[in-house]
Curated annotation (Swiss-Prot):
The chain crosses the membrane at residues 13-32. Pfam families: SDR. Short-chain dehydrogenase/reductase; part of the gene cluster that mediates the biosynthesis of UCS1025A, a member of the pyrrolizidinone family that acts as a strong telomerase inhibitor and displays potent antibacterial and antitumor properties. These compounds share a hemiaminal-containing pyrrolizidinone core fused with a gamma-lactone, giving a furopyrrolizidine that is connected to a decalin fragment. Its EC number is 1.1.-.-. It is an enzyme of class 1 (oxidoreductase). This is Short-chain dehydrogenase/reductase ucsE. It is a single-pass membrane protein.
Length: 264
């Protein structure tokens, strides 16, 4: 008998890189709610500790609490590959258990900048975590992921490469690079499935950090550019990551959740 959709993540090992806040935390929480074994990673120990506290808060038994673990990982560090291997060793308990799904939601803040103010390091910094970090995560994931179409590796992109705007020259190409990377990795990691998810404007701590005191006004303006006249909600976007994890025929795809902004 086929496994029910609601049960497909039960006891599966899910690693969420960037899983301590915003969209990544929502993905981790959704996986925990589906009874998966979840490992979250972030660059700061305090963020990992806080996320673990929140994720474990609603779990009744010690066994359930033990399903949720975390480790630091700085994708911009000089020893990033060493840290990635340490994360995968930690998650898999030194190879005793294969990882079923990896979701990469990590990314440093991306700030729009006028073209005449752009410097080389703006693009380099924007790409460091989202593109280079993702590539290196994939490089080492091959050893730890279960080699099956039931397994997945999911990246996070965006929609600015499709619908660009002024001052996004150092930012928009990063989204395009992530999508291209996902499609290429789908070949390299096959039969493991690789996809990207492209959210539109989502109200998260990350967005508030970028927009600062203008966050509400910016979000309202972006909502007006959608067909739904709304902004995304992290918990709703997180469900798409779970769909990709549990649907064994989605591969090499980019899934857009933008309220219809691309066709508005």
């Amino acid at each position: 008998m086929a496994t029910r959709t609601a049960d497909k993540l039960e006891k599966k090992l899910v690693v969420v890189v960037g899983g301590t806040s915003g969209l990544g935390f929502a993905v981790a929480q959704a996986a925990v709610d589906r009874k998966a074994n979840v490992v979250v990673a972030s660059s700061k120990q305090a963020s990992v500790d806080d996320a673990l506290s929140r994720l474990q808060a609603g779990l009744a038994s010690d066994d359930d609490v033990a399903r949720v673990r975390g480790l630091t990982l700085d994708l911009a560090a000089a020893n990033v590959e060493e840290q990635i291997v340490a994360l995968y060793d930690f998650a898999s308990k030194n190879g005793q258990q294969k990882i079923d799904h990896i979701a990469v939601t990590a990314g440093d803040s991306l700030y729009p900048k006028a073209l005449d103010q752009v410097k080389a390091e703006d693009f380099i910094n924007a790409s460091q975590v989202r593109v280079i970090g993702a590539l290196l995560l994939a490089k080492h994931a091959a050893k730890y992921l279960a080699k099956s179409a039931a397994s997945s590796f999911t990246l996070t992109s965006g929609v600015r490469d499709v619908r660009p705007a002024a001052n996004f020259a150092p930012v928009a190409p990063v989204s395009a690079a992530v999508k291209s990377l996902a499609k290429t990795l789908a070949h390299d990691l096959a039969p493991i499935r690789v996809n990207s998810i492209s959210p539109g404007a989502v109200r998260t701590e990350f967005f508030t950090k970028i927009a600062g005191e203008h966050a509400d006004a910016v979000l309202q303006g972006l909502a007006e550019q959608t067909l739904t006249k709304s902004n995304g909600v992290a918990e709703d976007i997180a469900e798409i990551y779970l769909v990709v994890m549990t649907s064994a025929y989605i591969d090499g795809a980019d899934l857009v959740a933008d309220g219809g902004s691309l066709i508005a």
